[in-house]
Amino acid sequence: MRNKGDFLFTSESVSEGHPDKVADRISDTVLDAYLAADGESRVACETLVTTNRVVLAGEVRGPSSVTPEALIEGARAAIRDIGYDQAGFSWKNAQIESYLHAQSADIAVGVDSAGEKDEGAGDQGIMFGFATRETETLMPAPLFYAHGILHRIRDLRKAGDARVAMLQPDAKSQVTLRYVDGRPVGATSVVISTQHDEGASQAAIREALRDVVQDVLPEGWMCPEDEFYANPTGVFVIGGPDGDCGLTGRKIIVDTYGGAAPHGGGAFSGKDPTKVDRSAAYACRYLAKNVVAAGLADRCTLQISYAIGVSHPLSVYVDLDGTGKDVDEAKLGSVLREVMNLTPRGIRQHLRLNRPIYTETSAYGHFGRTPDEARDNFTWEKTDLVDALRGAFNR
């Protein structure tokens, strides 16, 4: 997304009850179960969800205390927490099968370390991070508000608010914003599709959703009434995994920057932090956010690449999109290597990733979230490198 001129830009989000997000949630529940038992566990868990059936598959290495039965019960608890107790998909009677098996010894050889020697990356790949001064969380505005709308609906639904009592867990949102001189100034259209009880009034649903959107968007940003689309296809009773099959890792743009920045292609959920698809993408966001928070630029895109079995990144690329404040991008790339150890081990230690902190990342975006000091989560959203970055450029 460019940073100059007048244009429209759109991003979408999906709720925790979307089939693909149900799969992501279960995969991260499996991951957290292993990391809670042993922080050095290796996990690559894929999940398929469909009508009253859940299938777990992938590779793991961890303590035997994490039994298939425990993982199945964890998946069932996740479905219950999301809110599914429907004829076609219920936490009570969904058939859950686990086909998880041991991690490949060939992969383990390239990844494992000897003592304190840096281990190699779990795979080759490219990862991106991004930050922009458009919102208080330094996230792109269209995605920020698309997430915010669904998160607000979720909070109201789980709080038992009568206005949304007819709504069920599956939902999607899409927000189009108008930019003037490269800055967002208002919404031109908002789309929300949400699963609901049979017989629910579409007029009541529209009214409830309009109230949510107006609460989430800044004052004066609401789109014209004829560009507000609430359940535009009409009835949406059959939803969730009963309506569409869900798979882990199919919402990578929703998970990251809503299309406002490049994506390396690797999904996050179900992967332990030796997988640089996840951990290095978190590091890229962390560094990009700190660059913008330090006042070195208004926008920052960062790319890092790795090779399997090699500990150091093969490249670090920085693009400030013309918004740098007298900052040389090549020098900034070198400085970023200095302020953070970008080996897989270094990233995990710096961001404290070998902990069961992933379940809550599985919906409403991995980035732009608020760290909770008590739980020490979302560490990649902290801005604790600001002083070091300013010092490197004599600010």
From Swiss-Prot:
User: What gene is this protein translated from?
Assistant: metK
**Keyword field:** ATP-binding, Cytoplasm, Magnesium, Metal-binding, Nucleotide-binding, One-carbon metabolism, Potassium, Transferase
Q: What is this protein called?
A: S-adenosylmethionine synthase
NCBIfam families (UniProt xref): metK
Is ATP-binding one of the keywords? yes
Tell me which CDD domains the record gives.
Answer: S-AdoMet_synt
Biological or metabolic pathway of the protein: Amino-acid biosynthesis; S-adenosyl-L-methionine biosynthesis; S-adenosyl-L-methionine from L-methionine: step 1/1
EC number of this enzyme: 2.5.1.6
Question: How does this chain assemble?
Answer: Homotetramer; dimer of dimers.
Q: How is the cofactor bound?
A: Binds 2 divalent ions per subunit. Binds 1 potassium ion per subunit.
Q: Which GO terms describe its molecular function?
A: ATP binding; magnesium ion binding; methionine adenosyltransferase activity
Q: Which cofactors are named for this entry?
A: Mg(2+); K(+)
Q: What HAMAP family does the annotation carry?
A: S_AdoMet_synth1 (MF_00086)
Q: Name the SUPFAM superfamilies for this protein.
A: S-adenosylmethionine synthetase (SSF55973)
Region forming the signal peptide: none
Positions bound to ATP: H18, D170, A171, K172, D244, R250, K251, A267, K271
Top-level EC class: transferase
Q: Name one GO cellular component term.
A: cytoplasm
Q: Where in the cell is it found?
A: Cytoplasm
Catalyses which reaction(s): L-methionine + ATP + H2O = S-adenosyl-L-methionine + phosphate + diphosphate
Q: What is the lineage of its organism?
A: Bacteria, Pseudomonadati, Pseudomonadota, Alphaproteobacteria, Acetobacterales
**Would you identify the family this protein belongs to, as annotated?**
Belongs to the AdoMet synthase family.
Q: Which Pfam families match?
A: S-AdoMet_synt_C (PF02773), S-AdoMet_synt_M (PF02772), S-AdoMet_synt_N (PF00438)
**Presence of the UniProt keyword Signal in the record:** no
Question: What does the entry list as the binding residues for Mg(2+)?
Answer: D20
Superkingdom to which the source organism belongs: Bacteria
Main localization of the protein?
A: cytoplasm
Residues binding K(+): E46
